[in-house]
């Protein structure tokens, strides 16, 4: 059994005991989180969401992804700019699919 959830502007296919990485969620490690924006579960397609359906998980880790380097250069002048960015993420282990 699997479900398709919507979180952080993305749609993810999840199954029980699967680990997923999502955009930063403001909760502490070890806390339980419930996703209620379920697009598909157990053969039911939502319009846009399936009613009385939820996916529960436990937050395993809060962290930052690897750094990406952004380099901007204007070839007609001496202007150049180098920036780094590290995206925040939350690691969630799915424990229950209900619906």
From Swiss-Prot:
Keyword terms of this UniProt record: Ribonucleoprotein, Ribosomal protein, RNA-binding, rRNA-binding
Gene Ontology, cellular component aspect: cytoplasm; ribonucleoprotein complex; ribosome
Entry superkingdom: Bacteria
SUPFAM superfamilies: L21p-like
Alphabetized GO MF terms: rRNA binding; structural constituent of ribosome
Ribonucleoprotein among keywords: yes
Transmembrane feature ranges: none
A single BP term in Gene Ontology: translation
Pfam name, any one: Ribosomal_L21p
Record family assignment: Belongs to the bacterial ribosomal protein bL21 family.
Function noted in UniProt: This protein binds to 23S rRNA in the presence of protein L20.
HAMAP family assigned: Ribosomal_bL21
Quaternary structure note: Part of the 50S ribosomal subunit. Contacts protein L20.
Protein name in the entry: Large ribosomal subunit protein bL21
């Amino acid at each position: 059994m699997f479900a398709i959830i919507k979180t952080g502007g993305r749609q993810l296919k999840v199954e029980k005991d699967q680990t997923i990485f999502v955009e930063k969620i403001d909760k502490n490690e070890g806390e339980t989180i419930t996703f209620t924006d379920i697009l598909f579960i157990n053969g039911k397609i939502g319009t846009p969401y399936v009613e009385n359906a939820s996916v529960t998980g436990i937050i395993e880790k809060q962290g930052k992804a690897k750094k990406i380097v952004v380099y901007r250069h204007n070839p007609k002048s001496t202007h150049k700019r180098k920036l780094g960015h590290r995206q925040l993420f939350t690691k969630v282990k799915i424990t229950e699919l209900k619906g």
